[in-house]
């Protein structure tokens, strides 16, 4: 259980049971006094603006969007006016606890990644790491935010 910090970064975060459950875990940790930093690629946050704003309003939670869209409700317009944005993505997927342990892999956050829904299960792998690699992962959170 996190005592000091959670650094969380994902490419896709679905608004489904798994996504909402993990949001509630982050909120519970922040309410215990844990500093939470959440970094998401804005390309995959459709429908999450309200919950992300609520989370960001918590004094212990910082929400950052990588490559944020100027037009929140008309994202397609953002692609038309700035085509370079299409390939400028942040594919990081990690969950780091207290700067001591991290889970890094190919799995995003959503029912299809955890076998929790009716959708087919994506076959992705994650690894848990401790040691110097954790500091490198935390650095990437800072660089991309």
Model-derived segments and spans:
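HKD-type phospholipase D/PLD-like phosphodiesterase module
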Residues: 1, 5, 12-142
């Amino acid at each position: 259980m996190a005592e000091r910090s959670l650094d969380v970064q994902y490419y896709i975060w679905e608004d489904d049971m798994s996504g909402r459950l993990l949001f509630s875990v982050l909120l519970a940790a922040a309410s215990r006094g844990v500093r939470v930093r959440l970094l998401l690629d804005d390309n995959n946050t459709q429908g999450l603006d309200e919950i992300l704003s609520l989370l960001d309003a918590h004094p212990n939670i910082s929400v950052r969007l990588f490559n944020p869209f100027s037009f929140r409700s008309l994202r397609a317009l953002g692609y038309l006016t700035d085509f370079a944005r299409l390939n400028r993505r942040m594919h990081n997927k990690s969950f780091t606890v207290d700067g001591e342990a991290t889970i890094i892999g190919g799995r995003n956050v959503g029912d299809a990644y955890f076998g929790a829904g009716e959708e087919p299960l994506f076959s992705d792998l994650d690894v848990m790491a401790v040691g110097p690699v954790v500091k490198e992962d935390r650095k990437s959170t800072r660089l991309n935010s």
